[in-house]
């Protein structure tokens, strides 16, 4: 995983204290797979093969998990709820419980949405308008004032 070595990941670490007490973390990485239609037609491309570490959590969600665990450490508890097709998760939500806050990871290969990560705190939030592995476009939004 290269997420933690991206220049903006270091910026995230610097900005983190400014949000105050962290209350919620959201990471979303949803990308309609070019192989999903073949999967629906009965084929088993590697990205949808559990023997090849396929599926939404292992292929895309791992970047969300690396991003969150890299910033906050191992959660106290984690629960994964997946949309399953033919014994593989095509999309899913991983909820991680930390002392005092929750982190949610959304990963999907069967639908698409803008990628983003948000760290919400008592004094504002950090918004990253990119996939967690890219760490692009990091801004801080204080509760009162302009984005930085």
Language-model segment annotations:
Residues 5-6, 34, 112, 135:
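Short glycine-rich, flexible loops that bind phosphorylated cofactors or substrates
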Residues 64-137:
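Contiguous beta-strand/loop segments that form the cofactor/metal-binding neighborhood of enzyme cores
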Residues 6-76:
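Predominantly a Rossmann-like dinucleotide-binding segment in NAD(P)-dependent oxidoreductases
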Residues 134, 144-148:
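C-terminal helical cap and adjacent loop that interface with cofactors, partners, or active-site loops
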Residues 1-3:
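N-terminal Rossmann-like NAD(P) cofactor-binding subdomain of oxidoreductases
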């Amino acid at each position: 995983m290269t997420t933690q070595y991206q220049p903006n990941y270091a910026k995230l670490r610097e900005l983190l204290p400014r949000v105050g007490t962290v209350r919620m973390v959201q990471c979303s990485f949803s990308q309609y797979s070019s192989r999903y239609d073949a999967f629906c037609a009965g084929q088993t491309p590697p990205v949808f093969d559990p023997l090849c570490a396929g599926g939404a959590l292992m292929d895309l969600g791992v970047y969300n998990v690396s991003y969150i665990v890299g910033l906050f450490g191992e959660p106290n508890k984690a629960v994964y709820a997946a949309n399953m097709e033919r014994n593989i998760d095509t999309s899913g939500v991983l909820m991680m419980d930390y002392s005092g806050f929750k982190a949610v990871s959304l990963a999907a290969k069967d639908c698409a949405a803008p990628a983003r990560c948000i760290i919400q705190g008592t004094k504002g939030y950090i918004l990253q308008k990119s996939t967690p592995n890219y760490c692009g476009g990091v801004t801080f939004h204080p509760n009162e004032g302009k984005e930085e």
